[in-house]
């Protein structure tokens, strides 16, 4: 089996060619989720799960500031996806895109007086600057959780984290992604044996509206694998019930079995951003 190509090998640009899109996962996990996608015209966050101060710090690390954001997209209302929303979007008047059920739950949880909501119906598509955003339903224990496919001039970015199982609809949507963030939350045995998780929480995580295991993520990837997918990020890894090495090994083994050498595999982290992908 030939050695898997690195991100740099797959996305190396001709010398002096300008960068059309930059993508950075600022952090992913149960303590906060946030990704930054930018073009020449548009800069968006997908989720705002870190405090405003921490979000600003992580953006500064990639040479960016929240004042320049065009929008914040919200997948669902759990705290690890919205904890920084009011302080960022409210203070800076950044439009917040979500569906009505998520908005109503956010209004119950946060002070939203200064938030400018722009509502979509799950399943709809809309434009933000030069980006087109497709939305789709995902199975999770939130009011109306969604995933996104974001179309740019250089490819499609998919986001499917926080889902208990992968429906046909989810498969159909993420199959179109060139760059995909997919949940690989836990190892089932580690979760079952974890002394820090009460049985009720274990049941929730393992349910069809909980979180994807490493094996479930690998199974989903096998279902969608095609020439479209070029970069796969493993997201929302549990600190107590998974390890980066285990999540990576399970997915890498599956990709090798499928001879998917065209796919570059990367881990996300809770404590620091991933390297920026420049396209």
Q: Which residue ranges define each predicted feature?
A:
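Active-site environment of divalent metal-dependent phosphoester hydrolases
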Residues: 31, 79-82, 103-105, 142-143, ...
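Cap/insert and terminal regions of metallo-dependent hydrolase folds
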Residues: 168-269
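Active-site metal-binding motif and surrounding structural segment of the metallo-beta-lactamase
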Residues: 52-98
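Active-site neighborhood of phospho(di)ester-bond hydrolases with catalytic His/Asp-centered motifs
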Residues: 46-49, 69-77, 97-100, 158-161, ...
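Structured catalytic core of nucleotide-sugar glycosyltransferases
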Residues: 24-34, 75-85, 107, 123, ...
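Conserved beta-strand hairpin/beta-sheet module of binuclear metal-dependent hydrolase folds
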Residues: 10-62, 146-161, 179
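Metallo-beta-lactamase
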Residues: 100-147, 151-154
């Amino acid at each position: 089996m030939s050695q898997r190509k690195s991100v740099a090998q797959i996305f190396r640009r001709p010398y002096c060619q300008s960068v059309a899109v930059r993508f950075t996962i600022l952090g992913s996990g149960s303590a906060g989720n946030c990704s930054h996608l930018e073009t020449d015209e548009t800069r968006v966050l997908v989720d705002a799960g870190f405090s405003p101060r921490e979000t600003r710090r992580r953006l500064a690390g990639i040479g960016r500031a929240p004042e320049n954001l065009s929008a914040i997209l919200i997948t669902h209302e759990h705290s690890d996806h919205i904890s920084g929303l009011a302080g960022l979007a409210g203070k800076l008047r950044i439009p917040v895109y979500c569906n009505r059920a998520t908005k109503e739950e956010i209004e119950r949880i946060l002070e939203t007086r200064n938030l400018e909501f722009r509502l979509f119906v799950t399943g709809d598509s809309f434009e933000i600057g030069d980006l087109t955003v497709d939305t789709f339903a995902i199975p999770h224990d939130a009011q109306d959780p969604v995933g996104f496919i974001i179309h740019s001039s250089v490819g499609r970015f998919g986001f499917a984290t926080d889902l208990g199982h992968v429906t046909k609809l989810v498969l159909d949507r993420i199959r179109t992604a060139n760059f995909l963030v997919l949940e690989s939350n836990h190892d089932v045995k580690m979760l079952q044996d974890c002394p820090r998780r009460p049985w009720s929480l274990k049941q929730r995580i393992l349910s069809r509206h909980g979180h994807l295991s490493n094996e479930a993520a690998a199974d989903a990837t096998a279902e969608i694998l095609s020439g479209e997918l070029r970069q796969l990020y493993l997201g929302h890894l549990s600190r107590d019930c998974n390890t980066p090495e285990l999540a990576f090994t399970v997915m890498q083994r599956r990709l090798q079995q499928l001879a998917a050498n065209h796919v570059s595999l990367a881990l996300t982290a809770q404590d620091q951003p991933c390297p920026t992908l420049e396209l």
